[in-house]
């Protein structure tokens, strides 16, 4: 088997249908699609299976998040290469072949991701620099880029050639199975978000390259699974913050680690507290304020858990490891 395409689903069947319809034309015999259905609902699962019999479906009774869902998919994958693809991405087999060709140009490239545009045609950020002490603040990050523009490639700029960068998004990520195994695969420490930066960090620590291919383009309807309602939006945005703490714990050291933890929380708590107060004053009628109030409630509970257990992992990630 040449390629295994792995998609982790959370109640995004409508998006996946568009993705599979785009792939189905000319789909090679030596490729496979594996869908891991988190918190699987039997009726929808069965209906989709009958509609797309050429796809391998795995019912996961728990909502295990993105990274661990990918791990479940990899266990069943037979491909020499692995393509991790969000359910809200639309790509053709031709675009996938083009990305495979770009990767083949440099044998040292372990992970590669293409240009991604929204349904409105606007380009999305696909790569960036590894989290550090400075870039916890958007202002300081922008100032550093202003005074030292050559330090790292700019993810907002238009690029024509292959870009070697720190990390690329896991929304559409191609990697050889051998490199995936060498790196150690997706970390179960992250329930959702930042796991792609972690994977790329461990790759670069081994001397492997990470690349962005602007010559290949796919469509990404960003947030197709993570913004379906206020509760899910609060939960996923909370997990972004938690995953930043996990990354700091795993990859920073000494004083830097402590300062990163302080900044991750300290830069967010004042705004969340203000939003929660406004949420109460407006009788919880404004969805945006309800989302931020939910983030605050979850974040404070998380910090209490950190103080109690000494672990920075999300409770959801700990559940995956139990």
Where would I find each of the regions flagged by the language model?
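Short, acidic, metal-binding catalytic loop of nucleotide-sugar glycosyltransferases
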Residues: 21-30
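Active-site-adjacent helix/loop segment of glycosyltransferases
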Residues: 205-284, 291
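Conserved donor NDP-sugar-binding/catalytic core segment of glycosyltransferases
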Residues: 90-127
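A short, conserved alpha-helix in the catalytic core of glycosyltransferases
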Residues: 158-160, 166-217
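Glycine-rich, basic loop-to-helix element that forms the pyrophosphate-binding segment
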Residues: 59-77
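A conserved acidic beta->alpha catalytic loop
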Residues: 22, 37-45, 62
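Short, flexible, basic/aromatic active-site loop/helix in glycosyltransferases
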Residues: 131-165
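Short aromatic/hydrophobic "clamp" motif used to bind/position activated sugar donors
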Residues: 82
């Amino acid at each position: 088997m040449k390629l295994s395409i792995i998609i982790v689903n959370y109640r995004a069947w409508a998006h996946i249908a568009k993705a599979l319809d785009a792939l189905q034309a000319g789909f090679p015999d030596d490729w496979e699609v594996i869908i891991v259905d988190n918190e699987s609902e039997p009726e929808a699962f069965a209906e989709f299976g009958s509609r797309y019999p050429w796809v391998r479906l795995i019912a996961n009774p728990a909502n295990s998040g993105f990274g661990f869902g990918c791990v479940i998919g990899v266990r069943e994958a037979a491909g020499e290469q692995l393509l991790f693809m969000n359910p809200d991405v639309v790509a053709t087999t031709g675009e996938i072949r083009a990305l495979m060709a770009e990767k083949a140009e440099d044998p040292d490239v372990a992970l590669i991701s293409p240009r991604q545009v929204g349904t409105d045609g606007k380009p999305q950020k696909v790569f960036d620099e590894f989290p550090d002490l400075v870039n916890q603040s958007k202002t300081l990050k922008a100032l550093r880029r202003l005074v030292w523009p050559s330090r790292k490639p700019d993810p907002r700029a238009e690029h024509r050639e292959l870009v070697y960068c720190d990390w690329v998004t896991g929304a559409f990520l191609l990697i050889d199975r051998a490199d995936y195994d060498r790196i150690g695969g997706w970390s179960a420490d992250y329930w959702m978000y930042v796991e792609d930066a972690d994977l790329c960090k461990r790759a670069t620590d081994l001397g492997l390259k990470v690349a962005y291919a602007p010559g290949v383009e796919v469509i990404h309807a960003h947030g197709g699974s993570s913004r379906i309602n206020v509760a899910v939006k609060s939960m996923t945005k909370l997990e972004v913050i938690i995953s930043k703490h996990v990354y700091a714990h795993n990859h920073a050291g000494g004083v830097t680690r402590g300062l990163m933890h302080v900044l991750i929380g300290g830069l967010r708590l004042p705004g969340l507290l203000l939003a929660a107060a406004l949420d109460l004053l407006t009788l919880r009628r404004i969805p945006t304020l309800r989302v931020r109030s939910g983030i605050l409630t979850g974040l404070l509970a998380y910090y209490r858990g950190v103080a109690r257990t000494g672990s920075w992992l999300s409770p959801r990630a700990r559940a995956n490891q139990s």
